[in-house]
Swiss-Prot record:
The keyword Transmembrane does not apply. It comes from the Bacteria. The keyword Ribonucleoprotein applies. Part of the 30S ribosomal subunit. Contacts proteins S8 and S17. May interact with IF1 in the 30S initiation complex. Residues 8-30, 103-124 are annotated as: Disordered. This is Small ribosomal subunit protein uS12.
Length: 124
């Protein structure tokens, strides 16, 4: 425990909160180019083939981003937009690809939560 004199000499430092998405560099979204599109398996109690992409961002980072929704049209050299948001059962995946922007198509035949998957309103 510091003495009063030590506290006068140098005040206590506030610990700065570390960001959970450093590659975004304080921006809400970032553009990037897919360098690899592949599937990976989740952590222990879950079982699936999750679709992910390795993305080289305009901020210079290369990150792994999750591709949400059923079916996608992404391949190498596709230009995508990413946002923050981790996938709990995929270690190291801290970003989501935004569906329906740039080269990423929206989810086909989506009726609910359409805005999250870039799907247009179906014709009545």
């Amino acid at each position: 425990m510091p003495t009063i004199q030590q506290l006068i000499r140098s005040a206590r430092q506030d610990t700065e909160k570390q960001t959970k998405s450093p590659a975004l560099k304080s921006c809400p979204q970032r553009r990037g180019v897919c360098t690899r599109v592949y599937t990976t398996t989740p952590k222990k109690p879950n079982s699936a083939l999750r679709k992910v992409a390795r993305v080289r961002l305009t901020s210079g980072f290369e990150v792994t981003a999750y591709i949400p929704g059923i079916g996608h049209n992404l391949q190498e050299h596709s230009v995508v937009m990413i946002r923050g948001g981790r996938v709990k059962d995929l270690p190291g995946v801290r970003y989501h690809i935004i569906r329906g922007t740039l080269d990423t198509a929206g989810v086909k035949d989506r009726k609910q939560s359409r805005s999250k998957y870039g799907a247009k309103k179906p014709k009545a």
